[in-house]
Amino acid sequence: MANSQPKASQQRQAKVMTAAAGSASRVAVPLLLCALLVPGGAYVLDDSDGLGREFDGIGAVSGGGATSRLLVNYPEPYRSEILDYLFKPNFGASLHILKVEIGGDGQTTDGTEPSHMHYELDENYFRGYEWWLMKEAKKRNPDIILMGLPWSFPGWLGKGFSWPYVNLQLTAYYVVRWILGAKHYHDLDIDYIGIWNERPFDANYIKELRKMLDYQGLQRVRIIASDNLWEPISSSLLLDQELWKVVDVIGAHYPGTYTVWNAKMSGKKLWSSEDFSTINSNVGAGCWSRILNQNYINGNMTSTIAWNLVASYYEELPYGRSGLMTAQEPWSGHYVVASPIWVSAHTTQFTQPGWYYLKTVGHLEKGGSYVALTDGLGNLTIIIETMSHQHSMCIRPYLPYYNVSHQLATFTLKGSLREIQELQVWYTKLGTPQQRLHFKQLDTLWLLDGSGSFTLELEEDEIFTLTTLTTGRKGSYPPPPSSKPFPTNYKDDFNVEYPLFSEAPNFADQTGVFEYYMNNEDREHRFTLRQVLNQRPITWAADASSTISVIGDHHWTNMTVQCDVYIETPRSGGVFIAGRVNKGGILIRSATGVFFWIFANGSYRVTADLGGWITYASGHADVTAKRWYTLTLGIKGYFAFGMLNGTILWKNVRVKYPGHGWAAIGTHTFEFAQFDNFRVEAAR
């Protein structure tokens, strides 16, 4: 092919123009004469009258919950490549902020994340994967800002109530221990700490938290509140001077680019501390592009944080693929660098926390928006977006209709900015597949005639970044392996003496916490997987009454699931294995499938749901606590059978809905139990 440059790229080279004199070989291609007939607007970028608000950075959330669960299982080099796309400066998303869940043992959207203190006298700062993720982010960007926020809390904090504010000092102690543990065990400095995600705040608790932070020498840790709506936190700050003094940032979720009067009057930094939450298609990318600009223009928000960082959880869980990129196949190594990565780069690669917005930002006459930021040292970055309504709808809130049309936009630099003579140009086109182009560097734009003016031809669903910085880069790696379904023959004996992570690969805990465990006296089952909660957490979502961890392929139909099980609780204890489990995450209480239970009282049950409301079969089983048993569950078509220690216990049980789903293990209640030698043979 004589010219391999993408057609869209060729077209865009003709979209940037300047009337400035200069080397003809280095200016952008002039516009066609017919383009002069397109309506246009004039916009001034000026720092003469001072600057706007300080920019605090763009980031993403890991957790809320278990959204990075599968990432840790990826083999190298693919795991490191994914992390580079997220965190490496001037490579991909180049995020400024990483916000993580402070695991509290409860279901928090797509799974549970373990607490550092399951019980009052228990402390372990190596559970889960958020510590690891923060360290990996810091390796790539030592300046990345770290935030922690609880969604759920371990049950012991509630003293019998599902409420974290029963003992304010105890809850503050619990959170501060997490911050201290991050530093002591992982050399991680937490910069911001939150209160309780999307749940009520207690003003006295916030004051107590500040007091305890200061007592522990953590004056540098700032408090963000309340990670919910703008109200009532904003009015509370205005009415309570002591509370106003201890809150550094008002963080709102899914604000729709707008704030409220009380928040503005507070004088506090305003953040969209959780936003996006949209499938990472080009529509999701359009959503992300629009709110990155307009959260500041419309709402004075100086930071926007996406939920979630990377879609590393089974896609059929709630909000599948709602990360900046997708990495949900550690068994194959396949991942997808989705378009929100490159939308992020338009801002993150050319700004830093501590820069300032210009006062002269706003909306374009024919739809779209522009912001400009400076470091005060002569550098300038301008980000322009023209996202159409159709291609930028976020999952929430409702987006009123608006129109974007073809237009010319003339920008004039004034004040100290007029000294700028050249701008690097980066371009993205979203919208239809035939037009898409992600983060393409165009020709340098020269401003040599002293006017400080340039004109852009803008169409729908475009992003331009014009910047004095020359460090931008579209990083890349060779294509990852092809996508493959979860292996249909899978087994895990949990024989890991020194596990790198507390959880077994690919198991996704949906209620309860399942961790590697070592028996000191049982040689045959020395290394096992153990459900470690004996008390219901202070929940954020509707956790099930039974604990459960799912694994495999949601499309599995026929399967044989086998596992050695050990009930630790006499008389009332029970465990199960299951197949065709159809739901998880915040919907786990209503999960259906085929559940094969045995109980320490010498009985068994086969149910159609996790809650045990529909019973297929039941009867006597030679089972007691404190002994190992091998359970086998077979499902084929409309029939199922169950075996205990290799002997048929029940058979020819007719099963109906659902027709497919994951395999699973779990316990009857929040109780200790162990699992070993798990295996599944399945078919899609």
UniProtKB/Swiss-Prot annotation:
Catalytic activity: a beta-D-galactosyl-(1<->1')-N-acylsphing-4-enine + H2O = an N-acylsphing-4-enine + D-galactose; a D-galactosylceramide + H2O = an N-acyl-sphingoid base + D-galactose; beta-D-galactosyl-(1<->1)-sphing-4-enine + H2O = sphing-4-enine + D-galactose
Disulfide bonds: 287-394
Tissues expressing this chain: Detected in brain and kidney.
Signal sequence residues: 1-42
Carbohydrate-modified residues: 300, 379, 403, 558, 601, 645
Record-linked InterPro entries: Aldolase_TIM, GH59_C, GH59_cat, Glyco_hydro_59, Glyco_hydro_59_dom, Glycoside_hydrolase_SF
Subcellular location: Lysosome
Keyword presence, Signal: yes
Protein family according to the UniProt entry: Belongs to the glycosyl hydrolase 59 family.
Protein name: Galactocerebrosidase
Gene assigned in the entry: Galc
